[in-house]
Amino acid sequence: MGGIGVISGKGTRGGGHVSLGGATSQPSKARFEMHASTSAPTPPGTVNPFVSTTEDRLSTFAIDVDTASYTLTRRHLLEGALPDREVVRVEELVNYFRYTYPEPTDGGPFAVHMDAAPSPFTPGRHLLRVGLQGRRLSITERKPAHLTFLVDVSGSMQSPDRLPLAKRALRMLVDNLRDGDTVALVTYAGDVRRVLGPTGMESKALIHAAIEDLTAAGSTAMSSGIELAYQEAMKTLDGTSVSRVIILSDGDANVGATSHEEILKRIRGRVKEGITVTTVGFGLGNYKDERMEQLANQGNGNHYYVDSLVAARRVFQEQLGGTLEVIAKDVKLQVEFDPAQVARYRLVGYENRNIADRDFRDDKVDAGELGSGHTVTALYELELKPGAGEGLATVRVRAKKPRGEKATESVHPFRATSLAESFQDARQDLRFATAVMGAAELLRRSPHADRWSLDTVRDIARASTPKGNAEREEFLALLEKARPLLRAVAAR
């Protein structure tokens, strides 16, 4: 079986099954700038190309733990329709699933893991998996959370899968908070309303009643709602607790100062003050997925899509610690491929998380946040040169403490000797992640997947799904939903 590197985010080098620490030399900044890529906004639907290592040996991106794309894709398939290409973000489908990465053992905020195997899709190519596992904080370790719920109660939120579901999700979240946490509630439609100021958990009944009284009507003044939510959040901002605005909406905004760039600018400014944003999307039809994702990205938070109570339970109960508690911020990954070993590479997904190579060590450049217990997985397609030897790739991770301003860097080499001899010899989690990646590439009609087969994806997923694993079994069922839809597209 191919090896998987296990390295704590606190250390600098590692391989095999150990957690190591120590210093290491770093290449000069000029070297990184020489291979710099663009950091301009990536248009929706863009697919990362293959890159020659002689032109750019460095791949740099911000982590992403959002999962909204999987839930939204699932909703489309269950309703008998293919999602739009731009809705399918490969990294969010892959990161939706749980993988058994060992946790850090030396007190660091995360551990880094790597493994690789031949590609089951394209002969002569390999797949490299890079994973991060965040440290899990206990309930007692979690900081007090001061949450401001910003709820869209406009007319577009009337259907059962929107405001009624959002209310049930909020009640579930409140029931999983603890002493020391507070909740404020702001709504927006044609105007904005402060429903409840910061309220402690000793008054849960009052919070539940305020949520239950919410009704939908009118137009959508999102911009004004965000401003009032921040005013409420400032009341409990103390520099030591979690301060987060949670926006629940279908993303529509049609009244008020709703310039999208203006809203994003306000959110970026509030992040510097210590208030982050999580977005939770509801509904289908006119749902503005891209808008909700951008709000969360600029707010240093997460983007979720909730289509059922099961999905709400996952976000607000099972993964509440990760939803609320950041253990590392501005987390960047940079993978350096050895041109003597690797001819070309392609990062699958993360198109809207790309960072210029020269900005990897610029601590002023924003990146992604890692929550308690969160995992991050990235997959690369590689074309190796004949007789690839030792130094296949080096993974560098930079991250700041939750309230820090200076990042630390860890370095993790991956050697060609750690490659699995065959895809069947690869670890079960790598095989399943490959199946999810393959399905996502097919669903977004990636040009790199022209010769890939949904049958191959299904066979891989089936062989890497343990009996009783409900999440993976659901994925298998979704593949069957996708089959006739993809065939219909191919026949046109």
Q: Each predicted region: which residue ranges?
A:
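Exposed boundary/loop context
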Residues: 2-8, 14, 38, 211, ...
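Extracytoplasmic
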Residues: 84-99
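Intrinsic-disorder/low-complexity signature in envelope-associated proteins
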Residues: 1-39, 45
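Exposed acidic/Ser/Thr-rich ligand/metal-binding surfaces
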Residues: 111-331, 385-389, 402-404, 476-488, ...
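An acidic, Ser/Thr-enriched
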Residues: 28-76, 81-87, 104-112, 120-128, ...
